[in-house]
């Protein structure tokens, strides 16, 4: 009889423990499911791991489709000033580059640099690829190793995509910049500036419509 009572007590304890573990596991699953529907930001992690090695920390963010379907989300906007800063700072660190100025618009990056390179084509390709590595893929990159174009690019810095006749005004500068080496073609279907035939056709139509 005593053995039976002891066995019942042990069985009750095991069932209680399993029940508690089961509830804990279920709660963990619910928590994981809820967390998966929230964006994950690097800043959410323990800051102690990133306090002394900020430049070494990877960046990671995850979104799920329903987050944008179910509620109004603000469309991410690229900081053009910061992007221009990144391009210029990276460019000036390339071999034979002494000065670099960058203008980033809503669809292109204009990079003017001063160089003492004897291989202008190679340097142009390096500058172009550096800029392309920072901006969105659909952007076009125009470069020039003529320092005189720096002032033209700087003059546009106080303007914006909504400025009057900005496309027509900038097209002249872009055409002048393209007289400098532009590097190798981006792909079989794109020229050195990342323009396709369709892009160039649209540009011609825009000019004819003005």
Swiss-Prot record:
Q: Which PROSITE patterns match?
A: PROKAR_LIPOPROTEIN (PS51257)
Residues linked to a lipid group, S-diacylglycerol cysteine type: 18
Q: Which UniProt keywords apply?
A: Cell membrane, Lipoprotein, Membrane, Palmitate, Signal
Q: Which portions of the sequence form the region Disordered?
A: 176-210
Biased composition of type Polar residues is found at: 176-195
In this record, residues modified by a lipid of the kind N-palmitoyl cysteine are 18
Q: Where in the cell is it found?
A: Cell membrane
A Gene Ontology cellular component where this protein is annotated is:
plasma membrane
List the membrane topology term(s). Answer: Lipid-anchor
Q: Which residues form the signal peptide?
A: 1-17
Biased region (Basic and acidic residues) positions are 196-210
Among InterPro entries, the record links this protein to: Spore_lipoprot_YhcN/YlaJ-like
Q: What is its main location?
A: membrane
The name of this protein is Uncharacterized lipoprotein YutC
Lineage of origin: Bacteria, Bacillati, Bacillota, Bacilli, Bacillales
């Amino acid at each position: 009889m005593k053995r039976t009572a002891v066995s019942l007590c042990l069985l009750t304890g095991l069932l209680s423990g399993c029940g508690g573990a089961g509830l804990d596991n279920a709660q963990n699953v619910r928590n994981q499911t809820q967390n998966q529907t929230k964006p994950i930001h690097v800043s959410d992690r323990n800051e102690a791991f990133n306090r002394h090695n900020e430049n070494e920390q990877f960046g990671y963010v995850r979104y799920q489709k329903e987050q944008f379907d179910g509620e109004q989300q603000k469309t991410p906007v690229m900081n053009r000033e910061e992007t221009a800063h990144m391009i210029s700072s990276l460019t000036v660190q390339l071999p034979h580059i002494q000065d670099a100025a960058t203008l980033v618009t809503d669809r292109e990056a204009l990079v003017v640099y001063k160089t003492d390179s004897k291989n202008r084509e190679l340097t142009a390709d390096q500058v172009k690829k550096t800029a392309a590595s920072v901006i969105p893929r659909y952007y076009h990159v125009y470069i020039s190793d003529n320092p005189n174009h720096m002032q033209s690019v700087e003059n546009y810095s106080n303007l914006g995509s909504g400025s009057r006749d900005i496309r027509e005004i900038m097209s002249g500068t872009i055409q002048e910049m393209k007289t400098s080496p532009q590097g190798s073609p981006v792909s079989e279907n794109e020229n050195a500036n990342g323009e396709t035939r369709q892009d160039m056709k649209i540009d011609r139509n825009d000019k004819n419509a003005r």
